[in-house]
């Protein structure tokens, strides 16, 4: 009887501990949801000029169609590729760094220095977050 009591107490304690540590999977945000507004990011992405110095918009140099190169690589499937380029670097961090420091991760076959270099100074943090959120939807 004592053994049953001890097992019950341990089982109850484990159940409470697991409940306290775990979150509800249904509450997990969608990809990009915690980063920014993907709809606003798409709007910004498609504008021909962006930022305080009227820099070229993303769609000026990047296509959303697979294997279509305008100036830079296609962004079709970029969220998936971004998560696989560097071990230990999330897609979100890879994409953000690629906007803030374009020469940090130059895709094979493309030259460094081609991408506009000062988006980090010309776009607000919110605009960058929104662009990253949109890019994370491109799987």
Predicted regions and their residues:
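Bacterial N-terminal signal peptides that target proteins for export
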Residues: 1-10
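C-terminal motif of bacterial Sec signal peptides marking the signal peptidase cleavage site
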Residues: 17-20
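Electrostatic cytochrome c docking/interface patches
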Residues: 22-52, 89
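Inter-heme linker and motif-flanking segments adjacent to c-type heme-binding CXXCH motifs
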Residues: 24-27, 68, 137-139
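Gly/Gly-Pro-rich "capping" loops immediately C-terminal to redox-active cysteine motifs
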Residues: 35, 53-54, 59-100, 117-121
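Protein kinase-like catalytic domain
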Residues: 45, 62, 100, 136-139
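C-terminal capping alpha-helices of c-type cytochrome domains
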Residues: 93, 114-139
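Substrate-binding/catalytic groove segments of enzymes
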Residues: 105-110
């Amino acid at each position: 009887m004592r053994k049953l009591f001890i097992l019950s107490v341990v089982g109850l304690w484990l159940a409470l501990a697991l409940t306290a540590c775990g979150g509800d999977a249904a509450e997990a945000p969608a990809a990009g949801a915690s980063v920014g507004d993907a709809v606003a990011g798409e709007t910004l992405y498609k504008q021909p000029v962006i930022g305080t110095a009227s820099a070229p918009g993303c769609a000026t140099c990047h296509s959303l169609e697979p294997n279509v190169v305008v100036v830079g690589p296609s962004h079709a499937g970029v969220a998936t590729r971004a998560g696989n380029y560097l071990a230990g670097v999330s897609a979100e961090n890879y994409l953000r760094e690629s906007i803030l420091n374009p020469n940090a991760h130059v895709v094979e076959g493309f030259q460094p220095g081609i991408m506009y270099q000062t988006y980090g100074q010309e776009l607000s943090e919110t605009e960058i977050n929104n662009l990253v959120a949109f890019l994370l939807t491109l799987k």
